[in-house]
């Protein structure tokens, strides 16, 4: 009787572990499906409905043809990333809408990973990203590649690596290096990025 209870208990624990792993895998897959749908829809819709690129994107493309360390309005990263895509894809409008969504999706991935480490719960991680989708700068304004879109992944990466440094209570060279790298690129994306660094 003692052995049968242990056997049943062990089988129940195995089933609970299996069910927990299956749910985690399903949530991970759901997250990947969500970001794929976001990437495809927000690339296709403006590609099919807009007659031309948004004005900020056109302005930054013009800056990209003559890259400097800064311009009268904004730092150079936005023009640099657009110029890279221009060298690869030429004047295909869909490519610039795709670039926007790549930056947004990277931010989603970082937020999902950060929430997963913070909450230790994939459901809350997925909810975090879904709530972020409701924020104005992550949906309707995303087809326009400008400094606001350009800074999104670097903002998320700086918060993530800052948290990792404070959470571990020890200095990790890799985390410090990545924090510095993403902070630098973030500042070169939008000058107001300095507020995050000061905070």
Q: What do these predicted regions represent?
A:
Residues 101-105, 133, 149-162, 176-179, ...:
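Alpha-helical transmembrane segments of multi-pass membrane proteins
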Residues 3-42, 126:
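Start-transfer (signal-anchor) and selected internal transmembrane alpha helices
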Residues 45-60, 69-84, 90-95, 148:
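Extracytoplasmic catalytic/substrate-binding loops of multi-pass membrane glycan-assembly enzymes
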């Amino acid at each position: 009787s003692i052995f049968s209870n242990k056997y049943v208990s062990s089988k129940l624990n195995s089933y609970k572990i299996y069910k927990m792993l299956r749910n985690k895998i399903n949530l991970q897959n759901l997250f990947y499906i969500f970001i794929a749908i976001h990437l495809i829809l927000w690339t296709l819709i403006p590609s099919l409905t807009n007659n031309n690129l948004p004005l900020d994107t056109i302005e930054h493309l013009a800056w990209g043809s003559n890259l400097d360390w800064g311009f009268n309005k904004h730092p150079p990263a936005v023009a640099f990333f657009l110029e890279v895509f221009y060298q690869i894809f030429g004047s295909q409008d869909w490519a610039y809408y795709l670039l926007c969504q790549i930056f947004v999706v990277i931010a989603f991935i970082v937020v999902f990973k950060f929430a997963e480490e913070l909450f230790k719960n994939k459901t809350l991680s997925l909810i975090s990203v879904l709530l972020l989708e409701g924020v104005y700068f992550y949906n309707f304004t995303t087809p326009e590649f400008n400094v606001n879109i350009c800074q999104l992944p670097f903002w998320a990466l700086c918060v993530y690596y800052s948290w990792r440094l404070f959470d571990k209570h020890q200095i990790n060279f890799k985390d410090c290096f990545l924090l510095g790298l993403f902070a630098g690129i973030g500042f070169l994306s939008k000058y107001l990025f300095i507020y995050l660094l000061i905070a």
